[in-house]
A protein has these predicted regions:
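Short, hydrophobic/aromatic-rich segments at coil-to-beta transitions
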Residues: 1-3
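Flexible beta->alpha loop and helix N-cap segments adjacent to enzyme active/binding sites
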Residues: 5-37, 65-194, 258-259, 263-506
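Stable alpha-helical structural segments in soluble proteins, enriched in small hydrophobic residues
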Residues: 43-50, 68-71, 237, 241, ...
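Phosphate/ATP-binding catalytic cores across multiple sugar-kinase/actin-like superfamilies
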Residues: 224-250
């Protein structure tokens, strides 16, 4: 059975599911180059031949349950507790006697219980309401939260994810720049109290925060305080849910879980017998996959499980380029000679992380490497860069915190060596992808050769795009990035071809 699904929120996507597994996943922003954009007509042209006929259904928006379903079906667990934390989900009706007629809130935190094939139950939910809905409660002497039912709490305070969004817009960033705020937290020198009154209602900007955080240092200090407050809240939510249900299989989804610092903090504080799966495509770009998978299991009743193997789900790209024939060893030597090399393979990664199919690579040993790559991409100089390390060497170079692996770059880990300064953030940490040969054989072979030459089994890895643009989807996108920057080469390992930039020449 084939199922095609689409999500037209921000981060719009289309997904084609064949027999329960993702066949194609197209992210609108990669097609129209509008960051976090909604669906566009061009997105659908990739699916025309797959859906010549069939039944079209519009399913009511149940935003958080689609997040939860996505993480559950990718986890491989038979049953699980699914925790969803994001900016905001769908609208929920709230009415008298507590609220005005016609009032609505939005889901911000949800906890579901999932079991195969498609049995699910809402266990807990937090709903954010606009300030003006709360007149009745405010008249009773203050408002911070109300348990309308045992499993639902209504509040006027933003979710942890939207706190980041609101802080970003209040200091002049885009709402989706939470990653920058997380990077700034490491430069903090002082503690600043996070006042929840600054996060009341739906408005994505706080005038009070704008006034309070006028300098870069104040913004860094606040970022750290916000990071600490949010990760503590999420950790407590997960621990309480485990305690109340007794379930120790935990799936995490929603855009908040792109916060690698928080993920590591939560991991360190969970009991060792708890099994955790973080959905790598946990933002709204994964909604169409969650919808399709939930619908497939509802229609088929299948109990077959498909644990996630990788997220290279983009449209297969034809690679017809002219260049120099090379081996992985040749390219590894260029990396060792401190050339900046893009790597492009047929199918792009789903989600925001570049995992070796749409990456810019560099020698992590260069003490000026971070500044060089940030300048090349047009990024702020305070932002860290990630690394990909061969799985079998990871524990020698990073404090793995008892993690078996980190294949989707969802954890921030302490760097154990001074030999790789280019990947070290100011706090001596790095966002890490551990790589097995079975996950991406061409990428693995390149790093293996780099290790053979240098004795360092890892490379600096950042996404194949420049600041303000989206990650390259097509060969044309990648060539534009190559020739519009100070990159040296673009490597197509499936073809064994290396293309020099117009500046580098042959």
């Amino acid at each position: 059975m084939n199922i095609k699904s689409a999500s037209n929120h921000h981060d719009g996507t289309c997904c084609l599911l064949k027999n329960g597994q993702v066949d194609k996943h197209v992210i609108a922003e990669r097609v129209n180059h509008i960051k976090h954009g909604k669906l566009c007509p061009e997105t659908f042209r990739y699916f025309d031949e797959d859906m010549s006929d069939g039944v079209v259904s519009k399913i009511e928006d149940c935003h958080h349950i689609f997040h939860a379903a996505h993480s559950f079906y990718d986890s491989g667990f038979k049953y699980a507790l699914c925790v969803v934390v994001d900016g905001m989900g769908c609208d929920l009706h709230l009415g008298p006697p507590i609220f005005h007629e016609g009032s609505a809130g939005r889901e911000s935190i949800s906890v579901f219980l999932f079991q195969y094939p498609c049995k699910n139950k809402l266990f807990y939910r937090e709903v954010v309401v606009p300030f003006e809905c709360n007149v009745h409660i405010l008249d009773r002497g203050g408002y911070r939260g109300l348990n309308i039912k045992n499993n639902m709490r209504v509040t006027s305070t933003c979710s942890p994810a939207q706190m980041f969004e609101k802080t970003c817009t209040s200091i002049g960033m885009n709402w989706y720049d939470a990653g920058k705020l997380m990077a700034m937290a490491s430069y903090a020198k002082n503690d600043i109290e996070v006042n929840e009154n600054d996060f009341v209602g739906f408005d994505l900007r706080s005038i009070e925060l704008t006034k309070k955080l006028s300098s870069f240092q104040e913004q860094c200090d606040y970022a750290r305080s916000l990071q600490i407050k949010s990760q503590e809240r999420v950790k407590d939510l997960i621990l309480k849910s485990i305690e109340d249900t007794g379930i120790k299989n935990v799936c995490l989804a929603g855009g908040y879980f792109l916060n690698c610092v928080s993920n590591t903090y939560v991991h360190k504080h969970l009991p060792r017998d708890v099994n955790v799966f973080i959905e790598p495509v946990c933002g709204d770009d994964g909604i169409s996959i969650g919808l399709a998978k939930l619908r497939w299991y509802e229609l088929t009743g299948s109990r077959r499980r498909f644990p996630l193997k990788n997220i290279y789900n983009g449209i297969p790209q034809e690679i017809n380029v002219e260049g120099k024939r090379v081996s992985p060893k040749d390219v590894a030597q260029l990396l060792a000679d401190r050339k900046v090399i893009g790597i492009f393979q047929s199918r792009s990664e789903s989600g925001p992380r570049a995992l070796g199919n749409r990456s810019i690579l560099y020698d992590p040993r260069d003490p000026n490497g971070r500044d060089k790559i940030n300048k090349l991409k047009g990024r702020e100089d305070y932002r860290p860069l990630a690394a990909t390390v061969l799985h079998e060497h990871a524990h020698k170079w990073f404090d793995m915190c008892n993690l078996k692996e980190s294949p989707y770059m969802l954890y921030t880990l302490d760097v154990l060596s001074d030999e790789v300064p280019a990947i070290c953030h100011v706090d001596k940490t790095c966002r890490v992808q551990t790589l097995k040969k079975s996950f991406n054989k061409h990428y693995y072979k390149l790093i293996w050769e780099f290790n053979h030459i240098t004795g360092v089994p890892l490379v600096l890895n950042t996404s194949l795009n420049l600041a303000g643009d989206t990650i390259a989807e097509t060969v044309e996108d990648a060539m534009k990035t190559l020739n519009g920057s100070e990159m040296d080469y673009l490597y197509f390992p499936e073809k064994g071809i290396l293309v020099a930039s117009s500046q580098t020449g042959t």
